[in-house]
Amino acid sequence: MNILINKFKVIRYFIKNGIFNEEKAIEISKFDHNTIDALVHSQLLVQVDGRVYLDKPLYDYRYKE
């Protein structure tokens, strides 16, 4: 679980202020399969055509700084 929390922090850094960055999205997709599945299951990430995207409205709601 601690590894998953650390990866949430990485995602938070990549998508800071809710701005989606295509280059950073590629880095997010490098997470191991189990972590991506867990994030998708938590509805923080959505997976489309093998690419991983942040569910920005949920991100903005949960992680507003």
Descriptions of predicted regions:
Residues 40-50:
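A short, conserved structural fragment
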Residues 49-53, 57:
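Short, Lys/Arg-rich nucleic-acid/phosphate-binding segment
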